Amino acid sequence: MKDDQQPISRKAFMEELERYRKGSVTRRHFLGVTGLGTAMAVMGGSLPRMARAQDIGNRVVLATWPNYHDPADFDAFTDKTGAYTQVNVFGSNEEMLAKIQAGGSGWDVFVPTNYAIPTYVDAGLIEPLDLSKIPNYDPASYDPRFAEAGTIDGTVYGVPKNWGTTGIAFNSSKTGGVVDSWKTFFDGARDQFDGRVMVHDYQLTTIGNALVYHGFSFNSVDPAELAKAEELLIDVKPHLYAISSDYQPSMRNGDAWLTMCWTGDGKQMNTDMPEIGFALGKEGGEIWSDYYAIPKDAPHKDAAYALINFLLDPEVNAREALAHGYPVADARTNALLPQELLDDPIIYPAAEALSPLEFGAAVTLTDPNRAELMARFKSA
Amino acid sequence: MRLYALAVYAFLYLPIAIIALFSFSAGRSASSMQGFSLSWYGRALNNPFVMEALWTSVKVAFLSACLATVVGTMAALALTGMKGRVRRVFDLAVQIAVMIPGIVIGIATLIALVTVFDLVNPWLEPLTGLKLSLGTGSLIGAHGLFTMSLVVLLVRGRMETLDPALIEASNDLGATPFGTFRQVTFPQILPAILAGFLLAFTFSFDDFIIAFFVAGAETTLPIYVFSSIRRGVTPEINAIGTMVMAASLIVLIGAQLMLRRSQARPRP
Amino acid sequence: MAMTRSRARALLLTPAGLWYAAMLLLPLAVVLIFSFGERSQIGGYAPGFTLEQYANLPARFAAFRNTLTLAPLGTLASLLIAYPLAYYLAVKVTPKWKTMLLVLVIVPFWTSILIRSYAWIFLLGGKGIPAFLAMFGLEDVRLLNTPFAVLVGIVYGYLPLMVFPIYVALEKLDKRLLEAAADLGTPPWRAFLQITLPLSMPGVLTGSMLVFILLMGEFLIPSILGGGKVFFVGNALVDLFLQSRNWPFGSAVAVGLVLVMLVTVGLYTRAAKRFGAGRDDAALM
């Protein structure tokens, strides 16, 4: 009985089918070894087991961001399909792009942010999605603000994962209150929070928020404005605790008091340690949306579609949101989430708090001057 | 003096003790102790990606060490007592390979192979259906480059201390060149060859810097550890580190015992 | 006979030659070619011939400066800590314990440097040594993410490489020399300065060279223990290839690093020769 449940490979199945047709094995044997016997016996009741028969291989490789999934959901995916998920974590879109550009990344699914997708499309590195293989994706139920960047010139390259903001996480027991402006963030770093402030280790947000401090656009590539941002960053640098996108450990153990922070990380820390709060910079900052996408040279495309489809199942998606604390743009998923989560000011900030925020632009990602500025800042 | 030595050993082992201690934690945090449990060991051993990364690391380290030892020993044999331009070119190559920082080797190999593959694949793929990409091959090639050079240095150093009279005597007694090599030279350079092999294996097994650039889609154990650490250090990583160290300690002590026994045996 | 001998040599050298050509010569040639090229719009390499990348090298001046300060400092610190230990192992310890203690020096080397460096994050972070110091009234000591933390990580990571060559040199030392000196009434410290130290110089030079070379290309320890604030040339290279995807400039920086290394190591060997330390290529091992 146990053996019957083992999935049979496609090749072996065809061979058995051939033998059955030739009459060298009985129908009973054929149904037994191929597992069809069991499938027929339990037909109707257990569709997941049928899914096993559709051979997607035993692995899928996912490139994603830190603290962005519930590991239990990958176990559930393995139980359902037989495929293990290997999770590779990256710190920035630049890093993902560099790895994929060098070829042979080996990824099946990755999670680019809105502003990175045009670059992948231009470079021919990303696969147009066959939405018929992602039945769980229902465009109608998504807030178009957080879904539209996945479509370029009418072709869908990415389906929305989560959206969020880049704000400020602060340890109120040390900062003595809410920090909700980039002015306090950068000025405090040189004053009362000396040696306790962290900024991201990639140019987009670190330079972007320094620009916002001066009242410029988060996405500016204007040399004069960038020069002002550089001046600020280099002045602040000796007072920083660290330049790192992995800020949770330092915030949790109290070494750092203040950091640039993504929504979900803020929520995760706030849940475990209520003294750590999260606020949006009132001058502005970044709002973003992430997408599931498939690289052109993905080695396991069937498994890639299966994983994306699995993770977009509203029930799975809701479990994910409960674990990582990032907002979802899917109305079906939100309908499953508890009301206090939907009312949480960290996850779903009031509309007026969001209004000064900007989506990152494609040119912001690839601008060589911003890249060089970041390097000068880090080596200063 | 003794106190000083003790202090240095404490310095060397303090971080390791911490890793080992936290690996027994029952909680998820890798930097505090929350109860005692062996569960992280079970998890690490059952994690298919850990086992696969371990297997890749062992495979790459073993193959690159074998190749490097054989090719390096051959080169060292040829280079001993050799003069002229070829010798100078090889000496230079060995020196450069040993001296150039791993990060430069990693980057250079990455961009060179990616460029070559981009040129070759459009021709190769339609003809053979094969596509070259970074992976085990490039790892073995890049690791072996460095370790082969180490083997050359070790074996050549040993060759130069050999007594030429022994070889002459063997030749005079009518041994073929290969016979002389097998019966006289080889036993004498064997320790250097073995040392080279061990060094090569260790280097490749532990290397992160070069592998980080040239591994392509392959995951070696250090790469796995690196990407897990970015996902947040769990005691699972500490358990892996502790197991690798315990295993190497056993191997080292075993090798030591074997060496002692073979030394104790009277020479024929 | 002569003919077959040179043919045998050619045969023995061919595999190594091919390996060097494919994995050393070709990659270095590509780096050199790329360093004269241009960055393409989305990153990577675009063919061209320009000296712009080299002209831009001063933009990484700070990285070179940090590397050229912390690499010698780290080498020196390792040397100062390793020498007494090597001396103790070679001279003071009974043979019974010697092997055991030597093995104990290498064993940490077998755990990934990554994991060991992460252990230092805990030790140097607020809940580690600073909390310990606070018990003695030394409040608010900050160690992590400073050049000091990087230095500790470096010494920790490379200590065995320094201990071994010095140990080997001291082990070879003829103890009768010291006995003779003692018989002649030389005080121990003078015997050390006049006999032990000079004779252990080859080991000191080998170890220093080894550690120095490795430190020049280091990027892992600064990025783990320096919090992104201590920037080596290695870190600059990683960022250029793995973040901003500027291959031509990255290649130029790599060429710059190799040149700086050749010059410093060259100067070092010349100085070493003046010390009369014997053969240099042996010194590499």
Q: Model-found features: residue ranges?
A:
Chain C
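N-terminal signal-anchor/first transmembrane alpha helix
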Residues: M1-V31, L101
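Cytoplasmic-entry segments and transmembrane alpha-helices of multi-pass inner-membrane transporters
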Residues: A8-L13, L85-W120, L178-E179, F192, ...
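Short membrane-interfacial helix/loop motifs at transmembrane-helix boundaries
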Residues: L25-F61, L123, K127, G227, ...
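C-terminal transmembrane helix and the adjacent membrane-cytosol boundary/short C-terminal tail
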Residues: A2-L11, G37, L85, L89, ...
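Transmembrane alpha-helices
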Residues: P15-L26, L76, Y156, L161-K175, ...
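Glycine-rich helix-loop "coupling/hinge" segments at transmembrane-helix boundaries
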Residues: G43-G48, F219-W247, A282-M285
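Membrane-interfacial helix termini and adjacent extracytoplasmic/periplasmic loops
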Residues: R116-V155, W189, G226-K229
